């Protein structure tokens, strides 16, 4: 988004792969430094970031309808029959295409994983962690749905947004529907919020790595699991994740398909990890499971079955390329 903003202000500027790589590495190093601070400092930063994200989201939801200009040929808001129709950008049937679009939803809704990654660092975790999971999924889902409605009723040409030379659909959409200065203001707010979100992801990932290293799952677990004496946080795990992340960023030089596949692979890995304990609890442990103070009661088993069924359906779907048949080439395979 930062490079897209630069391209908007200077149409002659075209970001190169190495510029994208270096900027991303620079941001990741900043996130690593913040995530290496003491827990109290990180908590304050994340509380500020979470509040900023919620405020920013509601500001954007209000600003977009208020700023959409429209033209003589296009209305400010499109009619519901057009909004609620399926615009299939793949060569698969509409049903499959809709399921393939869930990749964005999966990543958006996966924010609920942070509370259980950080449960060891909060008081009254048996209640605080599940409450945070429910609030994250509920508030994020409803607010995200509201934003999607705003976008759906105002976007002019979806193919132009996706295929824009900016390489950033959100930036392309904003430029398409509103004046440039307002679009840049909203894009800037989004960048700040995304920066805060990225730091939260770094913290959550480092705690997962620390937990696995503590159980001896990695070859270098003896080093990764060390807790810094000054900050009382798993600093080594933070920088181990940072090194792995920088290595993965090298896929940028392999093209958009190569780096884009990370999102599908990451979604598959994350949701398989989430589903394994749900599957074991639902189909093997059953009534022997000892419930905590926060539970789903009689709805636990049917919800667990639905969760497992959803993952079974989505795993192969997330591996599908957007084209098939003679149009499918090795370069387009994930």
Features from the language model and the residues they span:
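Juxtamembrane interfacial secondary-structure elements that flank transmembrane helices
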Residues: 1-10, 62-79, 146-165, 203-220, ...
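Helix-loop-helix junctions that connect adjacent transmembrane segments
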Residues: 12-19, 51-178, 183
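TM-loop-TM module centered on a large, flexible mid-protein loop between adjacent transmembrane helices
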Residues: 4-8, 83-85, 132, 138-199, ...
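Helix-loop-helix connectors at the membrane interface of multi-pass transporters/channels
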Residues: 1-22, 116-125, 134-139, 198-237, ...
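Membrane-interface loop-to-helix entry segments
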Residues: 21-79, 110, 133-137, 263-274, ...
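Transmembrane helix-loop junctions in multi-pass membrane proteins
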Residues: 34-39, 182, 244-261, 286-287, ...
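Lipid-exposed faces of alpha-helical membrane segments in multi-pass integral membrane proteins
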Residues: 22-33, 48, 52-62, 139-146, ...
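C-terminal membrane-solvent junction of multi-pass transporters and transport-like membrane proteins
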Residues: 19, 48, 222-232, 274-333
């Amino acid at each position: 988004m930062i490079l897209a903003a630069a391209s908007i202000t200077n149409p002659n500027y075209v970001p190169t792969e190495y510029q994208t790589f270096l900027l991303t590495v620079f941001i990741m190093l900043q996130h690593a430094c913040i995530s290496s601070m003491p827990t109290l400092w990180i908590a304050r930063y994340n509380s500020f970031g979470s509040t900023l994200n919620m405020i920013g989201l509601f500001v954007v939801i209000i600003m977009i309808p208020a700023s959409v200009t429209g033209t003589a040929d296009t209305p400010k808001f499109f009619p519901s029959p057009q909004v609620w129709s399926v615009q299939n950008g793949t060569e698969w049937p509409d049903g499959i295409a809709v399921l393939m679009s869930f990749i964005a939803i999966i990543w958006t809704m996966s924010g609920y994983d942070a509370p259980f990654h950080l449960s060891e660092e909060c008081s009254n975790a048996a209640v605080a962690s599940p409450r945070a999971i429910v609030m994250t999924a509920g508030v994020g889902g409803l607010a995200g749905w509201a934003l999607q409605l705003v976008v759906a009723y105002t976007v002019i040409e979806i193919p132009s947004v996706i295929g824009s030379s900016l390489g950033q659909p959100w930036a392309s959409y904003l430029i398409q529907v509103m004046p440039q200065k307002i679009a840049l203001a909203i894009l800037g707010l989004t960048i700040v919020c995304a920066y805060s979100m990225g730091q939260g992801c770094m913290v959550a990932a480092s705690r997962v790595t620390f937990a696995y290293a503590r159980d001896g799952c990695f070859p270098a677990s003896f080093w990764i699991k060390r807790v810094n004496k000054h900050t009382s946080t798993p600093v080594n795990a933070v920088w181990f994740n940072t090194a792995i992340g920088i290595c993965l960023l090298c896929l940028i030089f392999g093209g958009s398909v190569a780096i884009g596949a990370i999102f599908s692979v990451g979604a598959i890995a994350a949701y398989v990890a989430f589903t394994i304990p749900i599957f074991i609890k639902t189909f093997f442990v059953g009534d022997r499971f000892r419930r905590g103070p926060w539970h789903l009661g009689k709805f636990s088993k049917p919800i667990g079955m639905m969760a497992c069924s959803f993952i079974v359906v989505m795993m192969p779907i997330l591996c599908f390329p957007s084209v098939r048949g003679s149009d499918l080439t090795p370069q387009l395979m994930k």
